[in-house]
Regions:
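Carbohydrate-active catalytic/glycan-binding domains of CAZyme proteins
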Residues: 1-218
Length: 218
């Protein structure tokens, strides 16, 4: 889909077809190139795609991690890249892998699983992001069902040997009994267009299909 303002979109074309799964795409800029990760449960690996003609053409160039990991999100802190993933199907554990290169190899964090047996906060809901000098990890609350709520974790400590986070006060996000995301919400991705900070999210007011929403930061 294409847009002139980041709010209103029109479908353009299918840019990636895969026999396995193409959910949870996150795009990264490395030098002058653009790369993308997608979830890897059915493929049994986390693959890295490179844009040949951004954003219309992509090719798989590497495998970052082997195993049925879901919802990968990479964040760079200092000279270290951290790859956040969660375990599939039950979604109750979160793991971190680190590398001194975006392209790996990624090694397991000594505190894994950094979240253990907690369906409320284990599964990623979007990209790890920084705002007002604080680092955040949006998470899916899968306690009762898939994609019920999005909660927000503040990452207090992140290194190759340590990890600590806490849930913020206004969590779950934008949740009201009569709101647009009353029964479902499972995506929260921050992005910037020019000087505007925006969020791609979704929600359902009743037990129906999730609907995409673009929200501007005031």
């Amino acid at each position: 889909a294409v847009s002139d303002d980041g709010v209103s979109y029109k479908h353009h074309s299918i840019v990636l077809e895969d026999e396995v799964s193409i959910s949870f795409p996150i795009v990264y800029e490395v030098g002058e190139d653009k790369y993308m990760t997608i979830e890897g449960v059915k493929a049994n690996n986390i693959r890295l795609f490179k844009a040949l003609d951004f954003p219309y053409s992509w090719t798989c160039v590497d495998t970052l991690l082997t195993g049925p990991w879901s919802d990968p999100s990479i964040y760079k802190s200092g000279d270290t890249y951290f790859l956040f993933v969660s375990t599939p199907y039950v979604y109750e554990d979160a793991h971190i892998f680190s590398s001194n290169s975006f392209f790996g190899p990624y090694v397991e964090h000594p505190m894994n699983p950094v979240v253990s047996k907690n369906k409320r906060i284990a599964r990623n809901a979007g990209n790890i992001f920084e705002m007002n000098n604080k680092l955040y990890r949006p998470v899916q609350d899968c306690s009762n069902m898939y994609g019920e709520k999005v909660r927000m974790m503040e990452i207090l400590e992140l290194s190759e040997t340590t990890y600590r986070e806490r849930e913020i006060e206004n969590s779950p996000l934008s949740f009201k009994q009569d709101g647009w995301n009353r029964t479902k919400m499972h995506t929260f991705n921050i992005f910037q267009i020019n000087d505007k900070m925006m969020v791609a999210t979704d929600g359902a007011p009743h037990n129906g299909k999730l609907q995409l929403r673009i929200v501007k930061r005031r």
